[in-house]
UniProtKB/Swiss-Prot annotation:
Protein name as annotated: Mitochondrial fission 1 protein
TM region(s), chain numbering: 131-150
One annotated GO biological process: mitochondrial fission
Main function: Has a role in mitochondrial fission. Has a role in outer membrane fission but not matrix separation.
TPR repeat start and end residues: 77-110
Gene this protein is translated from: FIS1
Keyword flag Signal: no
Length: 155
C-alpha cells in the first residue's frame, strides 16, 4: 500500500458538499465515460457522495469506493480509509471496523488510521451500552408490569 501522509479526519466527512458541487463531480465522471472514467474522477465523486447528508448518496459513494478498491491496488489504502468513514456515517460500524482494522494491520503506525479505529471502536462500545440500557429498561418495565398485575390479582 502506498504511504500518503494526509487523509481527512472523520469530522471532515460531515462538511457536506452542496448539490451543485456533487453534480460537477458527477458530470466529470460522465464526461470521461462513466464506468470507464479515471479512477481519480470516480474517487473524487465517491468522496463527495460519502460527505453528503443524503443516505442514498453515501451508499453510492461506498459502492464506488468498493469498486475502486477492487479495481486499483494502488488506491486500496485510501479506499479502506474512506470506506471506513462511509460505513461509519451509514451506521454500519462492524463493517467500518473491518475496513479500519485491515488498514491498521498494514500500517500500524498510521496515526490517522489509529484515530479512526478508536472512533469506530468507541461508537461500537457506545452502541452496545445503549443496547444494554434498552434491554435493561425493557426488563425493568416488564418486571414492574408483572408485579403490578400480580399485586392487583391478590386484592
Amino acid at each position: 500500500m502506498t504511504n500518503i501522509h494526509y487523509l481527512p479526519e472523520l469530522e471532515d466527512s460531515y462538511s457536506a458538499l452542496n448539490s451543485d458541487q456533487i453534480e460537477i463531480l458527477r458530470q466529470q465522471v460522465l464526461n470521461e465515460g462513466g464506468e470507464i472514467s479515471s479512477i481519480q474522477s470516480r474517487f473524487n465523486y465517491a468522496w463527495g457522495l460519502v460527505r453528503s447528508t443524503n443516505k442514498e448518496d453515501q451508499m453510492l459513494g461506498v459502492k464506488l469506493l468498493t469498486d475502486i478498491y477492487k479495481e486499483s491496488p494502488m488506491r486500496r489504502r485510501e479506499c479502506l480509509y474512506y470506506l471506513t468513514i462511509g460505513c461509519y456515517k451509514l451506521g454500519e460500524y462492524s463493517t467500518a471496523k473491518r475496513y479500519v482494522d485491515a488498514l491498521v494491520h498494514h500500517e500500524p503506525e498510521n496515526k490517522q488510521a489509529l484515530m479512526l479505529q478508536t472512533a469506530v471502536e468507541n461508537k461500537i462500545t457506545s452502541q452496545g451500552l445503549k443496547g444494554i440500557a434498552l434491554i435493561s429498561a425493557g426488563i425493568a418495565i416488564g418486571a414492574t408490569t408483572i408485579g403490578l398485575l400480580i399485586r392487583g390479582r391478590r386484592r
